[in-house]
């Protein structure tokens, strides 16, 4: 597979995990110190807009102009771009605090589809959940009246979320299972689910619907045979492996890769990049033929043109 090069844009913080394109072409990202940044379309000017007080991950636009933040520690937040005011929209589900709010997609009617990755581990122990394969992730929806409903449970590291262009389905990445699950919202299959993609070559992270109508998926790391062997083992082995110190756990292989699928699950784009200066793609956003990428571990975002 050909390896392409990315244009890397530094930000004043580490772990710019997701990327968002604003209505005027500005690029939004957020880092592990809680900062939410807005970049000019050319990436030359970076402005800190707000601080969440937690660990922001997925970013989306709300219909009222605010920026939705999936904060792994605090839940669903809304940021007013002009003032930087932060409002907590949802921090609990069924009376219990969310442990690992991760990614979201916003419907035209204001519903917010989002993931809670694990009932056992937080963002700070994400590798433990992946290794143990707790299968406690959920796909949730926040209705406009503020109520929250569980659409899917038992997901293996629930991660990225994307809506169909016609909002007939919502897709969710199961990082541990290397699949993209499609939950039907309308039509004769409403309420059921199937797969948009299976047996991916790596572990899917954040997803988004591009301006090209495709579902873009960040592939954080290639398939790891050691991780797969541990996950296939008995519960005691998985739990013991999850309790190993971070330095002793399997580490993501250094790579930078994104894929794009049509509504039939066909691969339209599969791009791998030189990972020397930017690796571990965890967020991806296409707009007008340019694709921006975020990373859980890099002090930067990056882009390429299709």
Regions found by a protein language model. Name each.
Residues 1-306:
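Sequence-structural signature of mature extracellular/luminal beta-sheet repeat domains
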């Amino acid at each position: 597979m050909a390896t392409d090069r990315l244009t890397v844009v530094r930000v004043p913080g580490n772990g710019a995990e997701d990327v968002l394109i604003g209505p005027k072409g500005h690029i939004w990202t957020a880092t592990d110190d809680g900062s939410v940044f807005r970049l000019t379309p050319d990436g030359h000017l970076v402005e800190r807009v707000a601080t969440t007080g937690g660990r922001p991950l997925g970013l989306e636009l709300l219909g009222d102009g605010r920026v939705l933040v999936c904060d792994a520690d605090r839940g669903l937040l809304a940021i007013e771009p002009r003032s930087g005011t932060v409002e907590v929209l949802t921090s609990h589900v069924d009376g219990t605090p969310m442990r690992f709010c991760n990614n979201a997609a916003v419907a035209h009617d204001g519903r917010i589809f989002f993931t809670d990755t694990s009932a056992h581990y937080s963002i700070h122990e994400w590798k433990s959940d992946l290794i143990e394969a707790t299968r406690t992730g959920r796909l949730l929806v926040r209705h406009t009246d503020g109520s929250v409903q569980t659409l899917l449970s038992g997901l293996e590291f629930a991660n990225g979320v994307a809506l169909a262009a016609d909002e007939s389905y919502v897709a969710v990445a199961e990082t541990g299972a290397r699949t993209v699950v499609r939950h039907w919202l309308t039509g004769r299959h409403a309420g059921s689910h199937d797969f948009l993609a299976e047996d991916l070559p790596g572990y899917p992270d954040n997803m988004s619907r591009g301006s090209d109508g495709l579902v873009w998926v960040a592939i954080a790391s290639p398939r790891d045979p050691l991780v797969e062997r541990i996950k296939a083992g008995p519960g005691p082995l998985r739990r013991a492996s999850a309790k190993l110190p971070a330095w002793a756990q399997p580490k993501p292989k250094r790579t930078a890769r994104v894929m794009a699928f049509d509504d039939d699950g066909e691969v339209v784009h599969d791009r791998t990049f030189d990972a020397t200066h930017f690796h571990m793609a965890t967020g991806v956003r296409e707009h007008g033929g340019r694709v921006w990428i975020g990373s859980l571990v890099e002090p930067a975002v990056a882009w390429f043109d299709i």
